[in-house]
């Protein structure tokens, strides 16, 4: 590495640290740590074990954020010192390069920590795909997205399960529900919520005309035991049915599939992945809790935006991304303007660039 390149990297790293400092509010962070530490010394702190564990985890996260930032500051100062010494002792260059690599790795990890800092970013995720109007073409597009997200999840090391699968009449799917289990699953996948638009020559059109199709994607965090969602038994209607996998695989001879309808809201969820009716009901209840909680959060967001006079529409139906197969190839996110030409790679699950751009855009928007 040339000295000029080293000097440039040191400048860029300092700029990143300055940006992190602005977004962190270190004084506020210290105050919050002190408050939580005082709270943990109270005599009745461990009376509510679940709440105590949550507070303890929150404190550990804040401490880690604070300490890591100061470690990076020290490492940054160290690289500057090495640079000054390099003019008199070239043998120190290797140590300088090692310190730079170490700092850049920590900076990259830290940036992702800041980007995934919203309340449920670390939770598992539930993702639903529903084709819009357009028959077989739209249902095939939904199936393509199903494949894309499955490949993405597997590449990330998530445990991906198909909770419910409704096959299309001729091809594709009518709906599918997936669960993604792993660190930051919801934090990564929340960027995918909205309507996805496809433009291509339809393989189902004998005239080979260009078609535009739409599919909606819903993403919810799977809630843990610290979040309570009150659901009355009287408000739930349960139906059972014979369940089977994609394409009619492993069809059960008994009714193990469970469909729950929340009567007050009309929300419907279903699970077919488990071999028992009890297991599927448990999974369906988790999905229903997540949907009802998400609905409540949307209502609160709408109230806040009404007070602010925010004109932005907060709906599942806002078009977020276009996938163009013809007359050229391009995938473009309409929120961040991030785009790539390699549509095949995107359909193979390579959506990290879109997720990264969304998280940075969202952090700036907040």
Curated annotation (Swiss-Prot):
Alphabetized GO MF terms: translation release factor activity, codon specific
Pfam families in alphabetical order: PCRF (PF03462), RF-1 (PF00472)
Alphabetized Gene3D superfamilies for the sequence: 3.30.160.20, 3.30.70.1660, Release factor
Post-translational events: Methylated by PrmC. Methylation increases the termination efficiency of RF2.
Top-rank lineage group of the source organism: Bacteria
Major location (coarse): cytoplasm
PTM annotation (N5-methylglutamine): residues: 249
GO cellular component: cytoplasm
Keyword Electron transport in annotation: no
Keyword Ion transport part of the UniProt annotation: no
Entry keywords, A to Z: Cytoplasm, Methylation, Protein biosynthesis
Subcellular location: Cytoplasm
HAMAP family assigned: Rel_fac_2
Family the entry assigns: Belongs to the prokaryotic/mitochondrial release factor family.
PANTHER family (UniProt xref): CLASS I PEPTIDE CHAIN RELEASE FACTOR, PEPTIDE CHAIN RELEASE FACTOR 2
Function text: Peptide chain release factor 2 directs the termination of translation in response to the peptide chain termination codons UGA and UAA.
Protein name, entry field: Peptide chain release factor 2
Gene this protein is translated from: prfB
């Amino acid at each position: 590495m040339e000295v000029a390149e080293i000097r440039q990297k040191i400048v860029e790293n300092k700029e990143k640290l300055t940006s992190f400092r602005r977004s962190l509010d270190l004084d506020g962070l210290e105050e919050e740590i002190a408050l939580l530490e005082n709270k943990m010394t109270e005599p009745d702190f461990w009376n509510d074990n679940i709440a105590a564990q949550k507070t303890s985890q929150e404190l550990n996260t804040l401490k880690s954020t604070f300490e890591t930032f100061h470690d990076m500051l020290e490492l940054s100062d160290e690289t500057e010192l090495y640079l000054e010494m390099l003019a008199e002792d070239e043998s120190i260059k290797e140590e300088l390069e090692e310190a730079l690599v170490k700092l850049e790795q920590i900076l990259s990890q830290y940036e992702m920590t800041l980007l995934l800092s919203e309340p449920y970013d670390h939770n598992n995720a539930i993702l639903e795909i529903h084709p819009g109007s357009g028959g077989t073409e739209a249902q095939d597009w939904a199936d393509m997205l199903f494949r894309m997200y499955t490949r993405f999840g597997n590449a990330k090391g998530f445990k991906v399960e198909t909770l419910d699968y409704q096959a299309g009449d001729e091809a594709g799917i009518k709906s599918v529900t997936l669960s993604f289990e792993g660190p930051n699953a919801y934090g990564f996948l929340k960027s995918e919520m909205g309507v996805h638009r496809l433009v291509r020559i339809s393989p189902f059109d004998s005239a080979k005309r260009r078609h535009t199709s739409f599919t909606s994607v819903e993403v919810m965090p799977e809630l843990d035991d610290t979040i309570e969602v009150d659901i009355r038994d009287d408000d739930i209607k349960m139906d059972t049915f014979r369940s089977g996998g994609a394409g009619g695989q492993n069809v059960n001879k008994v009714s193990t599939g469970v469909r729950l309808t929340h009567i007050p809201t009309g929300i419907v969820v279903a699970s077919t992945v488990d071999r028992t009716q009890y297991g599927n009901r448990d999974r369906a209840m988790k999905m229903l809790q997540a949907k009802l909680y998400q609905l409540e959060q949307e209502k609160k967001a709408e109230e806040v935006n009404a007070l602010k006079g925010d004109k932005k529409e907060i709906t599942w139906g806002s078009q977020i991304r276009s996938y163009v197969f013809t007359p050229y190839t391009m995938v473009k996110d309409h929120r961040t303007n991030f785009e790539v030409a390699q549509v095949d790679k995107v359909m193979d699950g390579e959506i990290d660039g879109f997720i990264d751009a969304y998280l940075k855009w969202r952090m700036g928007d907040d």
